[in-house]
């Protein structure tokens, strides 16, 4: 499971012009599910997202997690994070999980974040979405449940 995590001052996702999810201060998480991911990957990623200290404390040091700043999380599914462009110029997506399995794990991550008391907004799985954000910092972190980076 891969995630691009961005600290945002605001973010929203639209489908057919309608806002399906929006947050103010918080995290925008672009989430890709791999073919061999399972419940353990979802748990690891949810735990890491909730605990990730990328918000500044009073001293200006990145020392606070999203809940500690009253932030929310916008999670958007993005299978293209599993794209492989090592050969040729068109990425292949064979490492991405099939839609049914990917959706189940995407929903699991969102549910686990909610269980931790976080407000979670989402996009629409498999929809053509437009994501708008203001990256605060900018701060962007790459996470991988297999710790590849």
Swiss-Prot record:
EC class of the enzyme, as a word: hydrolase
InterPro entries: Daa-tRNA_deacyls_DTD, DTD-like_sf
Chief place of localization: cytoplasm
Motif Gly-cisPro motif, important for rejection of L-amino acids, residue numbers: 137-138
Catalysed conversion reaction: glycyl-tRNA(Ala) + H2O = tRNA(Ala) + glycine + H(+); a D-aminoacyl-tRNA + H2O = a tRNA + a D-alpha-amino acid + H(+)
Keywords per UniProt: Cytoplasm, Hydrolase, RNA-binding, tRNA-binding
BP terms from Gene Ontology: D-amino acid catabolic process
Pfam family, one: Tyr_Deacylase
PANTHER family: D-AMINOACYL-TRNA DEACYLASE 1, D-TYROSYL-TRNA TYR DEACYLASE
Family designation: Belongs to the DTD family.
Record remark: domains: A Gly-cisPro motif from one monomer fits into the active site of the other monomer to allow specific chiral rejection of L-amino acids.
Assembly and oligomerization: Homodimer.
Function text: An aminoacyl-tRNA editing enzyme that deacylates mischarged D-aminoacyl-tRNAs. Also deacylates mischarged glycyl-tRNA(Ala), protecting cells against glycine mischarging by AlaRS. Acts via tRNA-based rather than protein-based catalysis; rejects L-amino acids rather than detecting D-amino acids in the active site. By recycling D-aminoacyl-tRNA to D-amino acids and free tRNA molecules, this enzyme counteracts the toxicity associated with the formation of D-aminoacyl-tRNA entities in vivo and helps enforce protein L-homochirality.
NCBIfam families in UniProt: D-aminoacyl-tRNA deacylase
Protein name according to UniProt: D-aminoacyl-tRNA deacylase
């Amino acid at each position: 499971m891969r995630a691009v995590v961005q600290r945002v001052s605001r973010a929203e996702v639209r489908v057919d012009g309608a806002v399906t999810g929006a947050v103010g201060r918080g995290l925008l998480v672009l989430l890709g599910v791999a073919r061999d991911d399972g419940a353990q990957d979802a748990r690891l990623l949810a735990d890491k997202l909730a605990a990730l200290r990328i918000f500044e404390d009073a001293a200006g040091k990145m020392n606070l997690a999203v809940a500690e700043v009253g932030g929310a999380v916008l999670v958007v599914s993005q299978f293209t994070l599993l794209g492989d462009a090592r050969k040729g110029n068109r990425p292949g997506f064979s490492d991405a999980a099939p839609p049914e399995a990917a959706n189940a794990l995407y929903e699991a991550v969102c549910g686990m974040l909610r269980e931790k008391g976080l407000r979670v907004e989402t996009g629409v799985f498999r929809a053509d979405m437009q994501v708008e954000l203001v990256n605060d910092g900018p701060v962007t972190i790459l996470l991988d449940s297999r710790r590849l980076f």
